């Protein structure tokens, strides 16, 4: 899982600025999803992905720490997969539920090498299997996390494993990477270092694939690459464009660019190579999808919001969801394959204007518009956004 990487940041989605050859290779030999939706900020997105439940159910509707679910109150994806015999590990950023007992049980991770919050690159604190450590002056957090990842995969290569790899990149503040040109005079946070961080993230993705290949695990391993929310490139003065078209919205907005994120799935010999899937998915779908792929039973006695897209990963039609729901700190919207309705009453026709250029008048007398609005409003009524937290 990348941090703050939007569609515009990846060349396989038409991003105009920095080539991402390793991520592109996953897409060209796997499946790229066009309409995958997160929450608009990291904490709610990650909590939704790991629990299969919308923010109004878990309480995690913002990045406020007092909204984080407490240990033991939610069943998370690693716990589900452990019951099917999987070794589990969390590597990288931890910012979706409380840090009680670190990512160890009851959240379901056997092992962890993680840091709190975001944007930790140099001179920071982290936890290796719950032991607090500090980076040495020359250590780069992404490399430390990656070294742990390679060690875990190597040790667990003879058994099924689930690895939640939460990359540091490309959350602010953008620092120079070990690969940055030493002669670059730009200050931290600059557009030049943004591109460097995109490239370094892409390099790490390529190294994961190389590790799996070297251990002869690649054909038996499903890789899912996704981001936790939309991009922040515009804060650096970098236009959020795809093939020259400006995306409407970015991280922490309810516009299309805030929650529509990259999703690439690659499973050699199973996922049809080079395919583009136009089904709707949202982050509640990951738990049932990975449970199905891993032969695990879904938790009982809990409401799950997700729909498995495991059949689509295998090249089958499956049972695509008809709508997605996105919530952020009192705001929400429901979106189907063509229309989007927010709890502010604004409705958009996205068919020929994918970034919300066409507003559907609330007073429209078109029977189709009335029916579509009613259907989407019913979804919003059935999924009440939590009140805004201060």
Spell out what each predicted region is:
Residues 1-343, 350, 354-388:
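Formylglycine-dependent sulfatase
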């Amino acid at each position: 899982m990348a941090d703050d990487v939007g569609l515009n940041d990846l060349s396989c989605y038409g991003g105009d600025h920095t080539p991402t050859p390793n991520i592109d290779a996953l897409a060209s030999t796997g499946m790229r999803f066009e309409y995958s939706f997160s929450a608009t900020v990291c904490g709610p997105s990650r909590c939704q992905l790991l629990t299969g439940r919308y923010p109004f159910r878990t309480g995690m509707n913002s990045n406020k720490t007092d909204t984080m679910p407490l240990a033991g109150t939610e069943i998370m994806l690693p716990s589900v997969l452990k019951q099917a015999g999987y070794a589990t590990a969390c590597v990288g950023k931890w910012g979706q539920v409380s840090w009680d007992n670190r990512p160890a049980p009851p959240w379901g991770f056997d092992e962890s090498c993680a840091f709190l919050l975001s944007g930790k690159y140099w001179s920071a604190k982290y936890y290796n299997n719950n032991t607090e450590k500090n980076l040495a002056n020359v250590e780069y957090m992404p490399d430390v996390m990656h070294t742990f990842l390679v060690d875990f995969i190597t040790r667990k290569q003879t058994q099924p494993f689930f690895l939640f790899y939460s990359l540091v990149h490309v959350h602010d503040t953008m620092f120079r990477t070990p690969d940055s040109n030493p002669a670059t005079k730009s200050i931290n946070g600059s557009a030049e270092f943004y591109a460097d961080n995109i490239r370094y993230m892409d390099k790490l993705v390529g190294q994961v694939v190389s590790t799996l290949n070297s251990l002869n695990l690649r054909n038996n391993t499903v890789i899912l690459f996704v981001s936790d929310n939309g991009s922040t490139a515009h804060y650096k003065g970098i236009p959020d464009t795809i093939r020259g078209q400006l995306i409407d919205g970015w991280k922490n907005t309810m516009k299309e660019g805030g929650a529509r994120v990259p999703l690439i799935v690659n499973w050699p010999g199973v996922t049809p190579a080079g395919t583009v899937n136009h089904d709707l998915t949202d982050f509640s779908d990951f738990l049932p999808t990975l449970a199905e792929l891993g032969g695990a039973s879904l938790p009982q006695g809990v409401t799950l919001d997700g729909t498995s897209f495991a059949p689509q990963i295998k090249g089958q039609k499956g049972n695509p969801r008809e709508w997605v729901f996105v919530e952020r700190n009192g705001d929400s919207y429901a979106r189907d394959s063509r229309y989007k309705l927010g709890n502010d009453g604004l409705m958009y026709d996205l068919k020929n204007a994918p970034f919300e250029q066409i507003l559907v008048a609330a007073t429209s007398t078109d029977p189709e518009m009335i029916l579509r609005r009613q259907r989407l409003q019913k979804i919003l009524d059935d999924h009440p956004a939590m009140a805004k937290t201060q």
